[in-house]
Amino acid sequence: DVCSSDLGNPYLEPERIYMARANYILKKKYVFGLFANHHVNYIRQLYYQDTKALRAYYQSVNFDKHNTFGAMAVIPFRIGGAVSSRFVASGLLIQDEGIFIDIPFDRKKLFGQLMLFNTFTLSKKKNLSLEVNARYSAPSIQGIYDVDGIYNVSAGLVWNPIPKKLSVMLRGEDLLKGLRAKTHIDYPSQKSDMTIYSDTRSVSLTLKYTLGKMNRKNKKEIDSSRFGQ
């Protein structure tokens, strides 16, 4: 068996992020956007197998470059009067560059993410609805890692016995156990496959009660005479 341990990094520097985003809203409901993220000293933990001994290390390092560029779209729609849905799609380009111990890497990867949110009205009279959501992320990269795709299916039953006052939600997450991340490393001196077996499934019961009413303060009119209006 390989002995694994955490290896410190006294040269680790703080990470900074610069983000830019532009959105266009069509007919007050369809959203289309472009975005770019530039990371300086991007920090991630990577895995290294010692070439001279039967041991391995986990170490957090700074990447020389980590950029993401992408486009997204949000499409809401209804099916009859009982189903309200929202479809979200995004496509991204990842750029990772740096040196991890003695392994230089310069990689690019195109991948996508799909999400679908659905609300089914089971009973308007009893204020009972069912939420079923699904998400899929295509295979991507992280430094020297190749990361397999992951998916999540969740569902929640929502009951509002007192509208705008009391709500009860029973919710389940990761119903199909699709959030178990799998990574692969395939370099001349580094070959490994890793699966995170932590169980991410969960069931929760939420009770929410709103006390009183929110009274909005009267807004004062702005004196625009000084602007020549």
Spans of features found by a protein language model:
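Transmembrane beta-strands of outer-membrane beta-barrel pores
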Residues: K28, A36-V40, G91-E97, F120, ...
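Short, small-residue-biased leader/transition segments that mark boundaries at the very start
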Residues: V2-S4
